[in-house]
Amino acid sequence: MIYLIILIIIAIIVIIFFLATGLYIFKSTVTRELHDIEKSYTRYVENNLFDEALYNSASKEDITLKSFDGLNLTSTLIMNENPTNKFIVLVHGVSICYVGSLKYFDIFYKNGFNVLIVNQRRHGKSEGKYSTYGFYEKYDVNMWIEYLKSRFGNDIILGLHGESMGAGTVMETIPLNDSIKFVIEDCGY
């Protein structure tokens, strides 16, 4: 009888340990604290991580689309000053929002691309309660691709660039859309 009681106590301790560990992992990944947009932007400017003058002078359009599960998702479309059918979709990592993609803006813009910088769900001005590390985000990126095709035509040259969680997301998007011509996966997870 004493062994049964000890076994039950050990089982309860193990269950509590696994529940606590699961809660910790959930809070530190799926609902982790997001970076402040203004502070991140200021840090990127101070560290010369992108050409702010070029970014500010470029023609920008804020776009909001409704995701398959009803969230308002935001992006900024930057049309190149030289007309082109080349588009790149920049997808940031977890917790940083669109600011994390600005360091790649110059490279693509100066090489003749129109640039769509997205705010993944739960980031920036996009709605959402959780980051799903590509599980739902891949459908969001596919939605942005379809938006670009519907607006600019099926003959656009379309690439994806993702960093960290964004890299995982763009890799998961590949099987969803045959229009993707290239993908840059930068440090997936």
Name each region found by the language model.
Residues 68-79:
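A short loop-to-beta-strand scaffold at the N-terminal edge of the catalytic core in hydrolase folds
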Residues 95-103, 115:
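Serine-hydrolase catalytic-loop signature spanning alpha/beta hydrolases and amidase-signature enzymes
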Residues 91, 120, 185-186:
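Alpha/beta-hydrolase
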